[in-house]
């Protein structure tokens, strides 16, 4: 079943949401990110095709299945349904990006939609491009992934014991994966399929937070600064069609025109053909350039 949906409004809280402490440098997060970037640079000097191929495959698994199809379109917006085992699988894939656990990720993104480019938005470029891209991650509490705090904004996931466990141990799948990569291909494999793949995926997601609220076209007259950015869409499995998404947040399809390449939508359609995806919400857009006021 595919359900057509029109432009949507998300209610905005009258009070700014204070989610995380913004004071002080988060040294743990900062050191980890610096080390990952050093590893990504080192990978360029230890290239081999096997490690590169594994990195590309894991990028699809982690960022494509885990973030775009999982954390974002499934867990956060519930734009389609899959069997519970597949929902769990997508969540585990999402942790491989080092973007946090599922409860944390969905909470942050739901708040972003509720307060998009307004006071309380966790990562708005109105506070600076650097802040929106990565700055908001580098400050505040030592433990960003506070399950109890995030449960307020992701109560549906917080009711599930598996999601609570995964949120508290979101680092574990990457530790296991790093060990496997070392056994399979040594240091080059760890640097490419680990460090380089993670860093590239982080920046792809961060560009959705920063670039797609600064550069690109606006098909819909949303109340925020969201844009459709083709080059961000290319590296993020269709997440760059961000203005479309903010106008229709529960649509499983983000690329609404034939020329807006949206790999995640194609994969969701494939799951439907295989009988694994149902209750799919799709934005119904009569005119490609119609302006509509939405979330």
Where are these regions (language model features)?
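Active-site-proximal inter-transmembrane loops
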Residues: 153-161, 215-241, 246-248
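Non-catalytic, topology-defining segments of multipass membrane proteins
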Residues: 1-206, 211, 251-295
